[in-house]
């Protein structure tokens, strides 16, 4: 019997939960994390979500939808610190942990020697309890035989959910779910599938023939059909010393059409990936930006530097041209990702400006040290600062 050894961890309203761990008196209130002026909602409590507040809703609109919404500013360094602690707890259960984003990831319990599903469930329940007791946040878990089904399961009973999908029941588990539960099907895509094609539930998709699916989803129809059947052979990818690339992606709750907002997301990913590259003693040469549209089509484009680097600055000028080359359709985006490849650990060759580069590297090392000690926002790049209106 195949055991449900793939686990998806999804922290509940992560940014807000981290803030409420510091301000427990606000638990149970309608609150959200975000910028009050010209900002967007980064995370909303479940009480605020019940009033119609979602991510990434503009703050001004959120306050109209929910006038008694309590706005909480970002606490510098808090989220990365709690995220690191959360995944360290995961690694006490298994070394095979994939950090998919700051608040979610996968665990592979295959090598742990569990004999029964009950043993696995007991161990994961224990991890869920540890996270709540030690970090004062909650997380939801999905257990299945593959990543796709585990991810869907983890989101069904939030907050503090725990859903197990036994082996062999994947298609049966997915069939009655709304089509919007499949990864990549956002609200607008779901509205189109329901309104134009009558595909309301996952089982409705499976009732369509191949030709019709291709007409609806284009080249991505096989991926959609396999997803509806619960088929997924992707392994849990752990970080290791001989990594051939470093990557990060972000899927948006609502499609984003703002070029400036996507630029900020990409630069934030650069800022989060390069310290890890430095920590590993590596340098990278190539940056690739990938975008995905609501219909699951995607495009990517990459550029390479003349020499490998472990600094952020050389990659910032590539963000705008790469986005323009990848984002060719005049449509909002559902997902964006950044990937660094051309990984090397050889010293940079001496050049005319080698001394200046070494100074920048020493400065980066100091900033990394400060941010590790006090949090990742102790020292920020200019583009990380929220835009503020001029004084009146």
From Swiss-Prot:
It catalyses: DNA(n) + a 2'-deoxyribonucleoside 5'-triphosphate = DNA(n+1) + diphosphate. The record marks 15 as: Substrate discrimination. It is found in: Cytoplasm. One of its GO terms (molecular function) is magnesium ion binding. Keywords: Cytoplasm, DNA damage, DNA repair, DNA replication, DNA-binding, DNA-directed DNA polymerase, Magnesium, Metal-binding, Mutator protein, Nucleotidyltransferase, Transferase. Residues 6-186 form the UmuC domain. Mg(2+) binds at residues 10, 103. InterPro entries: DNA/RNA_pol_sf (IPR043502), DNA_pol_Y-fam_lit_finger_sf (IPR036775), DNA_pol_Y-fam_little_finger (IPR017961), DNA_polymerase-Y (IPR050116), DNApol_IV (IPR022880), PolY_HhH_motif (IPR024728), Rev_trsase/Diguanyl_cyclase (IPR043128), UmuC (IPR001126). Its main location: cytoplasm. GO terms for biological process: DNA-templated DNA replication; error-prone translesion synthesis; SOS response. This is DNA polymerase IV. It comes from Opitutus terrae (strain DSM 11246 / JCM 15787 / PB90-1). The lineage of its organism: Bacteria, Pseudomonadati, Verrucomicrobiota, Opitutia, Opitutales.
